[in-house]
Amino acid sequence: LYKCVPHHLHRYPAEEDRYALFLRQASRVACNIASVVDLSAPLRFAELRRRGVRKALSAGVSVEESEAWADFWGVLKDNLSHRFGAHPVHTLDEITRLHALFPGNIRLFTATLDGRVEGGTVVYECGDCVRVQYISASERGKECAVLDLLFDYLLRDRYASRRYFDFGTSNGDDGHFLNEGLI
């Protein structure tokens, strides 16, 4: 099996790998869709998201880079378990070990309210591209739209000078299931 490198991760646009697969008469067994924002031509936030940003600000939500991995992992595990009967691909120990090995490339950003982590995401930095994984909020965080404020900060401030912001894939079952809520 081979997974093609997404176009936005190439330093120079190229598809030699796809051509080699064609020559070998390879067949596709899966197809995923990635949601990527070109920050040199950003999309306008939907009105619902802009209202969410205002709601989070008026509630007193703050956003920051954080070392509160255990607090966020608790929010993430609860959310995945209750909504999907699933668990994170990485354990808390694994993700903190990866962060310790690559502190300039793997970061945690959290949204807090009254001193409690109510949401967050893990960010992977690689050249001109930023990719997020493990986007999650508690029930209270969802009520206060903490993720709208978090992504407003990440897209418009923290990573505005990067080229691409990759939200990851929105599929399951090798591409046969599309989670439209992630698009």
Region roles according to the model:
Residues 15, 50, 148, 152, ...:
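Residue-level marker for well-ordered alpha-helical positions
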Residues 5-142, 158:
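A conserved beta-strand-loop-helix scaffold within acyl/acetyltransferase catalytic domains
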Residues 124-126, 158-165, 178-180:
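A structural signal for short secondary-structure junctions
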Residues 167-183:
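Conserved catalytic-core subdomain
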Residues 1-7, 158-170:
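Conserved GNAT acetyl-CoA-binding A-motif
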Residues 1, 142-156:
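Conserved acetyl-CoA-binding loop-helix of GNAT-fold acetyltransferases
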